[in-house]
């Protein structure tokens, strides 16, 4: 999901949707947000700050934290769970241009969602079990867990 705002309090509606999705063996993956401004860094915004929704941070091709990627906060649920490529990502745009390069946690999120689909297809995992597989198989990074969660998403 590529929605975002700078509201640090979690939303009851988003949390209920995340819980219902997990109960029905579905996983919602959302961008952590692009409004990091030290000090202290701005934290994960809605809907990714809901405990039942997986929050995705962005890293570059050198596995450095993207300077815009929000980090974990002290509010319940406002934590980064995993990271994906989110800097200089080649993506489609309307004609006539066809393609362009973008940065953002909204570029990292489809990487995580795509890998989740591969894990689900290969193992049959769904919902919370899929969440656990993604985070337990992520590549640890030499960055704070508060910024990248369990690390870089990995394929099967």
Role assignments for model-derived ranges:
Residues 1, 24-26, 52-55, 67, ...:
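C-terminal subdomain of the subtilisin-like protease fold in secreted/lumenal serine endopeptidases
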Residues 1-13, 25, 31-32:
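Short acidic, glycine-rich surface-loop motifs adjacent to enzyme active sites
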Residues 8, 12, 102, 106-110, ...:
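Soluble non-cytosolic domains of exported or imported proteins
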Residues 11-16, 41:
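Charged helix-capping and loop-helix junction motifs
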Residues 15-22, 120:
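Surface-exposed amphipathic alpha-helices with a cationic face
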Residues 26, 45-121, 152-155:
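Extracellular S/T/G-rich loop segment that most often corresponds to the catalytic His/Ser-adjacent loop
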Residues 35-40:
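Active-site environment of divalent metal-dependent phosphoester hydrolases
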């Amino acid at each position: 999901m590529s929605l975002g705002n700078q509201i640090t309090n979690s939303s009851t509606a988003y949390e209920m949707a995340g819980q219902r999705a997990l109960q029905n063996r579905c996983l919602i993956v959302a961008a952590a947000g692009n409004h990091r401004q030290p000090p202290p860094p701005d934290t994960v915004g809605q809907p990714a700050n809901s405990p039942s929704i997986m929050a995705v941070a962005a890293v570059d091709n050198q596995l450095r934290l993207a300077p815009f990627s929000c980090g974990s906060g002290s509010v319940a649920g406002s934590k980064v769970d995993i990271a994906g490529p989110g800097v200089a990502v080649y993506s489609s745009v309307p004609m006539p241009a066809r393609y362009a390069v973008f940065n953002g946690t909204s570029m990292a999120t489809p990487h995580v969602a795509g890998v989740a689909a591969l894990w689900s297809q290969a193992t049959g995992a769904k919902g919370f079990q899929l969440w656990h597989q993604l985070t337990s198989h992520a590549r640890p990074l030499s960055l704070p867990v508060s910024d990248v969660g369990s690390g870089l998403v990995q394929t099967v």
